[in-house]
Every structure is written in structure tokens, then in C-alpha cells.
Curated annotation (Swiss-Prot):
HAMAP family: Ribosomal_bL31_1 (MF_00501). Part of the 50S ribosomal subunit. This is Large ribosomal subunit protein bL31. Binds the 23S rRNA. GO terms for molecular function: rRNA binding; structural constituent of ribosome. Gene3D superfamilies: Ribosomal protein L31 (4.10.830.30). Belongs to the bacterial ribosomal protein bL31 family. Type A subfamily. SUPFAM superfamilies: L28p-like. Keywords: Ribonucleoprotein, Ribosomal protein, RNA-binding, rRNA-binding. One of its GO terms (biological process) is translation.
Length: 71
């Protein structure tokens, strides 16, 4: 085998941008930034909030009210 052709594998701290928790991974990359981790992801936390869906329903109801009052 040839020596020194493989990248250096080291432990890297990966920081979640949502909750700020740090995880330690093995990687060849210097810095890892996570959008969502197991600490704050809805699947792992059991949180079943439907913020997006709720907002869309409210928007639909506002449009419906406008159409009723203008008609």
C-alpha cells in the first residue's frame, strides 16, 4: 500500500444550527454544521406540531372570509 495517500481521519465537532447541541463524528472534513439533529428533529422528539399546516389553514380561512364579505 502507498503511504500518505489517504486523507486524515479525525474526530470533529458538528454543531446543530437549530438547537446548538454539539455532536462528535469521525470525518475528514474540518467543520460540520447540521441543520437539524436528533435532539431537535420532530421524529426523534415525538413533537407532532403542524405549524406549517396550521398557518396554511389560517391563511385559507382569511381568504374565505374575504370572499364571503366581498360577495
Amino acid at each position: 500500500m502507498k503511504k500518505e495517500i489517504h486523507p486524515n481521519f479525525k474526530e470533529v465537532k458538528a454543531t446543530c444550527t437549530s438547537c446548538g447541541k454539539e455532536h462528535i463524528f469521525g470525518s475528514t472534513v474540518e467543520k460540520i454544521s447540521l441543520d437539524v439533529c436528533s435532539n431537535c428533529h420532530a421524529f426523534y422528539t415525538g413533537d407532532r406540531s403542524t405549524v406549517k399546516a396550521r398557518g396554511r389553514v389560517e391563511r385559507f380561512n382569511k381568504i374565505l372570509e374575504k370572499s364571503k364579505t366581498s360577495a
